[in-house]
Design a protein with these regions (language model features):
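N-terminal active-site segment of His-dependent metallophosphoesterases
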Residues: 17-106
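Binuclear metal-dependent phosphoesterase catalytic core
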Residues: 20-41, 240-282
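His/acidic metal-ligating clusters that form di-metal
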Residues: 81-91, 158, 167-250, 277
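Core catalytic region of metal-dependent phosphoesterases/phosphodiesterases
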Residues: 74-150
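Sec-dependent signal peptide recognition
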Residues: 2-8
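C-terminal motif of bacterial Sec signal peptides marking the signal peptidase cleavage site
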Residues: 12-15
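Beta-strand-turn-beta hairpins that frame and shape the catalytic cleft
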Residues: 49-61, 147-161, 190, 244-250, ...
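Active-site glycine-centered loops adjacent to acidic/histidine catalytic or metal-binding residues
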Residues: 65, 96-97, 125-126, 196, ...
């Protein structure tokens, strides 16, 4: 394993492009703290988004890990088109790793910014930060730490989006998460949290930079289970997984990468109860 990592480091160091190699292997909390600060500044100026839907039962779509390389993201575009055509659906989420290399973020951001499509909400992934990608990502999406509401005729649901692209939430974001749950969760019917990196990992398929420390995992679990969070969605591993801890569902998505054999997205049906389905591509 050590030999393999050393080979990867040497290959990356030989590249002409400025790849942030250190960040791939060592979680840097100062990076996420800086991004959180910038995200919260944007949030304060922009205000909280509230989506109003005409019924108490509604649907939303969620995907992760597009990994755009040299071709436009056909499966992501298809999912957005399906969501728009679905009369029960009103928005979608994209949980990070838009990029594989350093180019063509606009192929996704243009789809998400198209006013003819339903609203889309994104968070940053670890691949999106390589090649100093945060500035490009921020210019397109503005914030990766935020929450929004969905208002129905009788209820309000809260959706919390988190930045874990360095394999840590960092102290600033943890404090922000605790505050949001303490001050905004009451009065909401359901609470959904979305994050790129898996909080409950069931395999070791990804780099160690994206593992939460055990201490941080315990703290996050304590925060989430103590605030009556319903579901936590993540991507990153490219292989679906469903775990339950403390009454909270932790769901890892497949990737939606065009050449992935197991590519899928999810639909989530929200009402008095919550249902979900993985939708594969044929």
């Amino acid at each position: 394993m050590v030999k393999r990592l050393l080979i990867l480091l040497c290959l990356a160091a030989a590249s002409c492009d400025k790849l942030e190699v250190t960040h791939m292997f060592i979680p840097l909390s100062q990076d996420v703290n800086k991004r959180v600060e910038e995200s919260l500044v944007w949030n304060a100026a922009a205000g909280v988004t509230t989506l109003t839907v005409p019924r108490d039962n509604y649907r939303w779509y969620v995907c992760s890990d597009i990994h755009v390389d040299q071709n436009r993201p056909a499966r992501f575009a298809e999912m957005v088109s399906r969501e728009k055509a679905d009369e029960d659906a009103f928005f979608y989420q994209m949980l990070g790793d838009i990029l594989f290399g350093k180019e063509h973020l606009d192929w996704v951001s243009d789809i998400m910014a198209d006013p003819s499509n339903d609203p889309g909400f994104a968070i940053v992934g670890n691949h999106d930060l390589f090649y100093e990608g945060w500035e490009t990502w921020k210019a397109a999406f503005h914030s990766s730490t935020y929450y929004y509401y969905v208002e129905t005729p009788q209820f309000r649901d809260i959706y919390i989006m988190l930045d874990s692209a360095n394999g840590t939430l960092g102290e600033k974001q943890l404090a922000w998460l605790e505050d949001v749950l303490e001050t905004k969760r009451d009065g909401c019917r359901h609470c959904f949290v979305s994050v790129h990196t898996n909080i409950l990992r069931t395999d070791t398929s990804q780099f160690p930079s994206t593992n939460f420390t055990l201490e941080e995992t315990y703290r996050i679990l304590d925060i989430l289970t103590g605030a009556n969070v319903d579901m936590v969605f993540s991507g990153h591993d490219h292989v679906r997984d469903i775990s339950v801890f403390g009454g909270v569902y932790f769901i890892t998505l497949d990737s939606i990468k065009d050449d992935a054999s197991n590519a899928s997205y999810m639909t989530v049906d929200v009402g008095q109860t919550i249902g979900y389905s993985f939708i594969p591509f044929e």
